[in-house]
Amino acid sequence: MAKKSMIQRELKREKLVAKYAQKRAELKAIILDINSTEEQIWEAQIKLQKLPVNSSASRVQRRCKVTGRPHAVYRKFGLCRNKLREYAMAGDVPGLKKASW
């Protein structure tokens, strides 16, 4: 199981991403807009750089909902491979069955 502090850190990052998502999208739109002047683009880039680093969506890492494990997490289930196998063998994951051919 992951340390509780690491799980809380990821939750804090998710909150920051949600808080700054709209502002970040607006600044990126200005930067990518063809009709923007160089000064507008320059100002938008500076404002974007001044936003918190953890407000970027790429900083958030998927974690297992049960254990908090950061690696080998299946997006569809939100579980790491170990817990997914454990739950699948117990029949707790609807629609999932062991492959046999």
From Swiss-Prot:
Keywords: Ribonucleoprotein, Ribosomal protein, RNA-binding, rRNA-binding. Pfam families: Ribosomal_S14. One of its GO terms (biological process) is translation. The keyword Nucleus does not apply. Binds 16S rRNA, required for the assembly of 30S particles and may also be responsible for determining the conformation of the 16S rRNA at the A site. It comes from Francisella tularensis subsp. novicida (strain U112). This is Small ribosomal subunit protein uS14. Transmembrane segments: none annotated. Part of the 30S ribosomal subunit. Contacts proteins S3 and S10. GO terms for cellular component: cytoplasm; small ribosomal subunit. GO terms for molecular function: rRNA binding; structural constituent of ribosome. The keyword S-adenosyl-L-methionine does not apply. Belongs to the universal ribosomal protein uS14 family. The gene is rpsN. SUPFAM superfamilies: Glucocorticoid receptor-like (DNA-binding domain). PANTHER family: 30S RIBOSOMAL PROTEIN S14, SMALL RIBOSOMAL SUBUNIT PROTEIN US14M.
